[in-house]
Amino acid sequence: MSYVPAPTETAQAATPGPTVTPRRSVLVTGASSGIGNATVLRLAQRGWRVFAAVRKEAEANAINAQGVTNIETVLLDLGDRRSIQSAACEIKTRLGTQGLDGLFNNAGIGLMAPVENLPPDELRHVFEINVFGQIDVIQAFLPLVRQARGRIINNGSVADHFTPPFAGALASSKTAFASITAALRLELRSQGIHVCLIEPGAVHTPAVKKTLGGLEKVISGWPSESKVLYANALRQVANIAFAKSDRGGSPPEAVAEVVERALTARNPAARYLAGNDSIKLAVLAWLLPEKLLDLAILRFFGLPTTFGKS
């Protein structure tokens, strides 16, 4: 593709000479592992100047130890607005007179539990990170993106299209973020800023293990009646989801490739389905009547399909 730099992206040498076009720059949140880290490495290897945002100093050190040029780490905590503002100021200083060509909002968290037993504080935390924290990042970095007429790429989920049992917290937060993305896309269109949504299916990442690894702790806090009603079903859904991710999920590098496409395409799509099963799942959600989709989901997870019978 042909890349047209923003007017502020050229720099004159100290003595008369040819114009130098700086590398394109991008901020990737949640860069310590999984999709975020794969995207950081892919873009850096293709010459981008990559700002890899992580929560902890140890995570920054681990990225630096990978020894890949073009990567600059920055500390950014989606749950802390001051941290986000500080990161924005730091990156603005590092960029100098240049803007930010790309923003990939990738960081997020998951939670599996029946709606009846969702701890309100934990549900709020999921939305704080997956929705409000993402909005904080967009608001903090949009002036830099606007300066470069860059792009905003948001990481959603194929669960935007359907909600598995016990995934209400994650799916609802991702659906909310998809709506925010759609509104932002329309609002920034006249400003020449593309906004895209990536919708991965099952991906083999540490985030899946982290979500599933704490299930027994979650179950242990339920009242006895809830354990009888939900515990075995939740374990079954979790085990199938883990197996799907572990054995049939796409590598994070496959999603990173789609992110790069969204950043570089001349006319990027509004949404990109990413991964082995994302297209199939989205098409099923689009085509099947909701009651049939419910039955298909229940059968996939081996749960009872007869109404009123467990």
Each PLM stretch: what is its role?
Residues 116, 162-169:
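Active-site loop immediately N-terminal to the catalytic Tyr-X3-Lys motif
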Residues 138, 173-176:
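Active-site helix of classical SDR
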Residues 190-245:
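C-terminal beta-strand-loop-alpha-helix "lid" module of Rossmann-like NAD(P)-dependent dehydrogenases
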Residues 76-89, 120:
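The beta1-alpha1 cofactor-binding region of Rossmann-like NAD(H)/NADP(H)-dependent oxidoreductases
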Residues 114-115, 122-124:
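Substrate-binding pocket helix/loop in short-chain dehydrogenase/reductase
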Residues 32-33:
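Conserved glycine-rich cofactor-binding loop
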Residues 157:
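Residue(s) in the substrate-gating loop at a strand-loop-helix junction
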